[in-house]
């Protein structure tokens, strides 16, 4: 009987005006504004901290490609906090989108999701619609180039281009020591994937298999022949080829 009383009391409390959601706050977001996320969350009017549909809110937020995960936290007495973990830009991909060789630049996350198109003109209406953080992060990300025509990026979808996936595997498979020196990756095919370092050295990795072993060989050659190497081929990791400046 006592449990029944508590159950009825809890139901009544959750459906009363107690602990009404009066404020929605956002934490952890960098590429999305608080207003954007609050609008996307669409917390129903009249919600309380006791009856709010946290799963529904999380599902709506996760529909945005920047949102990797989210927790909806109740902060009593009247605040709902949206704690966002965002995807980050792992690479910027120059994609040929039509037979006229029109190229678009797209931000790609480390898990292979297309995040957003990055307009070349930052001052255009489309460019101004993006936060500065997108352009700032894009400037510091590796660029993947030479992608053959055929890919159709769409924000929120996962990349299914094998050339891009292999290039991403090369980028994410390297340690910071070499990855931090990267400038761009040419990915005309999986077998010919080539990384260009900031110092101009080109490294032909080929496929991303055995990437740590390939990286180790490259670092060793660069150390042994410092300032003298312009090209390294480690497509076959146990038979490296290098060319001097």
Regions found by a protein language model. Give the residues of each.
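Terminal hydrophobic membrane-targeting helix
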Residues: 12-117
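Charged, solvent-exposed interaction patches on well-folded alpha/beta domains
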Residues: 1-8, 71, 77-245
